[in-house]
């Protein structure tokens, strides 16, 4: 962990203490939180393992996948029955469901059962989103997913360029094939994920990918910089920060000129189109291996071991492996960190969540950020500037490599560690 990250944490949290995660495993969860609650479901199986991908995954094996699906439904039943935020006999209203992976469509045939299990305890108000590998964008798969209730898909294109896709060890998707499948099996909202800051990639390369995505079925694109995690097998070097900023500014300028609306740090949408986000939920329950649960005062992560996950659920025990109990200041910072992804922090929303004014909690920090040109204060909200978006990205990169990289690296090696300090 860099001195810069440690200094920033100490200044912002007002404490020299590291973040302490323990093996606390509650048998009851309390989802009583201000505002909407979201749900996340993780499906870890892939046809092949991409070297650059940091997420919890393993090769698809039918028998293991079936056992996992049963355990996933079992965890949903356990949490639903033990959730103190749900009135017995009634369904708890939630905003939306997001299904990530892995390649969740490998279990498309079980997705309806998973959604019905969730539906016994939770009433989904704003639809179901699901990640798709380009090879799974087929009419018959889309039909299964629609039948299960999926209303949004995010397609992991990364790049349509054969040269750039080969750097990631993947074949380049055919945009015409994607468009034909989406036309035959339409989904209300389609997002496509793209990567920038790859070796030899120009701004024009990224713009061409964005244009192909928008011309072949996407309502929305997410354009992420490549991040080199220490525990992956990727040999692709990360770009310098200056190069990332040049590309990010050029992407934002192009989208502004062509009328695409920037609705988060990395995402751009057609005007008036449906939005797709997997990141901007203040509180959510996570199901499946490696899934995170974020509540009013706690952060929990499930084991990264598929076998360990299945065994824990079969024993009737919660599969969480580490829990962080937030201080009030830490929880405020975590809230602001994720709200900043959406480019706007609402003063009313902060007050509703914490019962205190944003300026009262972070007056000096907000003043400094405005003076430095990172934020502008609008009626009722603070908005990130283009400069602020870049420096947020830079801070997020340090956070990712200093905290997430270390945590995920440990959890890939140990199914149920006793403690983690970061």
Residue ranges and their predicted role:
Residues 41-57:
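Local cysteine-cluster metal-coordination motifs and their immediate loop/turn environment
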Residues 39-41, 155, 384:
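Short beta-strand motif preference
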Residues 389-422:
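Short, amphipathic alpha-helical interaction segments positioned at domain boundaries
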Residues 1-37, 47, 85, 90-91, ...:
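Flexible, acidic/Gly-rich N-terminal and inter-domain linker regions that tether
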Residues 36, 58-82, 93-356, 414-415, ...:
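C-terminal scaffold of the Radical SAM
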Residues 356-370:
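Short amphipathic alpha-helical interaction segments
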Residues 382-389:
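Basic, amphipathic "hinge/linker" alpha-helix immediately C-terminal to the N-terminal HTH DNA-binding motif
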Residues 370-380:
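A short, conserved structural fragment
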């Amino acid at each position: 962990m860099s001195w810069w990250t440690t200094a920033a944490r100490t200044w912002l949290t007002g404490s020299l203490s590291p973040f302490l995660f323990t093996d606390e495993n509650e048998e009851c969860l309390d989802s009583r939180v201000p505002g909407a609650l979201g749900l996340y479901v993780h499906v870890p199986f892939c046809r092949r393992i991409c070297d650059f991908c940091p997420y919890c995954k393993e090769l698809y094996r039918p028998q293991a996948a079936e056992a996992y699906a049963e355990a996933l439904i079992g965890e949903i039943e356990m949490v639903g029955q033990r959730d103190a935020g749900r009135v017995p006999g009634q369904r708890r209203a939630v905003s939306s469901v997001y299904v990530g992976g892995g390649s969740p469509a490998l279990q498309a045939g079980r997705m309806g059962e998973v959604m019905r299990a969730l539906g016994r305890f939770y009433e989904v108000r704003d639809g179901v989103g699901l990640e798709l590998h380009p090879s799974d964008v087929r009419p018959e798969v889309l039909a299964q997913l629609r039948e299960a209730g999926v209303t949004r898909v995010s397609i992991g294109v990364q790049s349509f360029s054969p040269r750039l896709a080969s750097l990631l060890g993947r074949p380049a998707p055919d945009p015409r094939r994607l468009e034909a499948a989406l036309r035959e099996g339409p989904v209300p909202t389609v997002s496509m994920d793209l990567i920038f800051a790859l070796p030899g990639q120009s701004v024009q390369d990224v713009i061409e990918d964005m244009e192909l995505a928008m011309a072949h079925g996407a309502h929305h694109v997410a354009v992420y910089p490549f991040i080199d995690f220490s525990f992956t097998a990727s040999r692709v070097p990360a770009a310098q920060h200056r190069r990332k900023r040049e590309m990010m500014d050029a992407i934002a300028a192009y989208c502004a000129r062509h009328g695409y609306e920037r609705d988060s740090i990395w995402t751009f949408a057609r005007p008036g189109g449906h939005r797709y986000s997997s990141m901007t939920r203040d509180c959510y329950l996570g199901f499946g291996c490696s899934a995170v649960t974020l509540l009013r005062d706690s952060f929990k992560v499930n084991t990264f071991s598929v076998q360990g996950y299945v065994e824990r659920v079969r024993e009737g025990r919660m599969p969480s492996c580490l829990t962080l109990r937030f201080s009030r200041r830490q929880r405020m910072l975590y809230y602001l960190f994720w709200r900043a992804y959406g480019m706007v922090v609402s003063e009313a929303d902060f007050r509703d969540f914490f019962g205190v004014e944003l300026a009262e909690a972070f007056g000096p920090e907000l003043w400094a950020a405005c003076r430095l040109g990172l934020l502008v204060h609008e009626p009722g909200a603070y908005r990130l500037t283009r400069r602020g978006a870049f420096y947020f990205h830079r801070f997020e990169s340090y956070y990712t490599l200093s905290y997430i990289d270390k945590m995920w690296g440990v959890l890939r090696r140990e199914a149920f560690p006793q403690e983690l300090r970061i």
